[in-house]
Amino acid sequence: MLKILVPTIMLFLVTWSSPKKWLWPITTTHSLLIALLSLLWFKWNMDMGWDFSNHYLAIDPLSAPLLILTCWLLPLMILASQNHISTEPIIRQRIYITLLISLQTFLIMAFSATELIMFYIMFEATLIPTLIIITRWGNQTERLNAGTYFLFYTLIGSLPLLVALLLMQNDLGSLSMIIIQYPQPLSLSTWADKFWWTACLIAFLVKMPLYGVHLWLPKAHVEAPIAGSMILAAVLLKLGGYGMMRIIVMLNPLTKEMAYPFLILAIWGVIMTSSICLRQTDLKSLIAYSSVSHMGLVAGAIMIQTPWSFAGAITLMIAHGLVSSALFCLANTNYERTHSRTLLLARGIQVMLPLMATWWFIANLANLALPPTPNLMGELLIISSLFNWSSWTILLTGLGVLITASYSLYMFLMTQRGPASQHLLSLNPSYTREHLLLNLHLIPMLLLILKPELIWGWTF
């Protein structure tokens, strides 16, 4: 653990001591080395259980894939931001990179925390750098509105969790995840216990987000700069899923009767948000709503608590993290050239940028869960486990899969095919940096096809 945390903290010093000319190459290289070093965490499988660095930090098969995804994303965010941030004054560039590094540090400590209260503190700490990135480097004046939505939705959802954790500490005498999972099931029967159950999960359902409390996400995605969108889609939403998987195993037997309304919202949300995608004119908003749709499947899977559903949830979270981040990078390459996110104004780009169209095609096929991508493995496991839980769910999940395929192809056709506008005929060519960025997103996803058990979490 420390072999990753210490170099990450050293990256703060590197950022502030590097000469202006070498700031971006040095920070990118250093963060890429950390990402490669983090791949060693893949060796923790179920036989080995927890691997402790100390009493408060440990890795297990559930947290290892998410930790690696977090480390993998930092060099990609720095690469993606280089074009539009490198024109700013040097002090702003350093602050921007520092915020990204601090976000990675908080996320590493959140995913590896063994104490629930430490997890809660790190969960909340990620708010601060994300909020600054959105409100300071966002594209339009609506970024302040988006920042307010993001802050208040997350805070209002998180406060009941703090009260619930304090009550848990009072009852059980400990908040260690390792200790809490072994006592006898809690005898939860009163109305107060039902409120406590809801308080434990609502923060994570807002973060995922569940349909109904998802309104902050499209706003935050649309207004955030590219690095903000990438980290939000790839890792911050997964904090909600990870937190749910950690805490829901402690809340039985109440989950069996309390989960129904949330399950219905999650599965209905898959159809609703997928349908909203078909009506979008803003490219980033379309990708943001597709994230809500995918995370609805994850929320439903975690609620039913079977080995298959847990494996499907973690697999889909990792696969979606890589694919949605790649889609935001592709949307950003379009935006940097056309200065518009409107689908109608950027048609027929395949003629000018044929290789970029190939990346669009691969990313969209992965998004619609083409065999044999990890997205398909995750969705199949989730849909199968939901079908075993209730055969009626196949109608909703099946329809959701069809609409997902429809909006993915719609997004590809609207951006790449059709007659090219006159104002697009003088576009800048694609750069090696952009192709490297997309390679580093999509090649790991394709390699996971060869050994998917690396991201199956507890069940392997």
Curated annotation (Swiss-Prot):
One of its GO terms (molecular function) is ubiquinone binding. It is a multi-pass membrane protein. The chain crosses the membrane at residues 22-42, 59-79, 93-113, 114-134, 148-168, 195-215, 225-245, 258-278, 286-306, 310-330, 351-371, 394-414, 440-460. Keywords: Electron transport, Membrane, Mitochondrion, NAD, Respiratory chain, Translocase, Transmembrane, Transmembrane helix, Transport, Ubiquinone. InterPro entries: NADH4_N, NADH_Q_OxRdtase_chainM/4, NADH_UbQ_OxRdtase, ND/Mrp_TM. It is found in: Mitochondrion membrane. One of its GO terms (cellular component) is mitochondrial membrane. Its EC number is 7.1.1.2. Its main location: mitochondrion. The keyword Electron transport applies. Pfam families: Oxidored_q5_N, Proton_antipo_M. It comes from the Eukaryota. One of its GO terms (biological process) is ATP synthesis coupled electron transport. Belongs to the complex I subunit 4 family. Core subunit of the mitochondrial membrane respiratory chain NADH dehydrogenase (Complex I) that is believed to belong to the minimal assembly required for catalysis. Complex I functions in the transfer of electrons from NADH to the respiratory chain. The immediate electron acceptor for the enzyme is believed to be ubiquinone. This is NADH-ubiquinone oxidoreductase chain 4. The gene is MT-ND4.
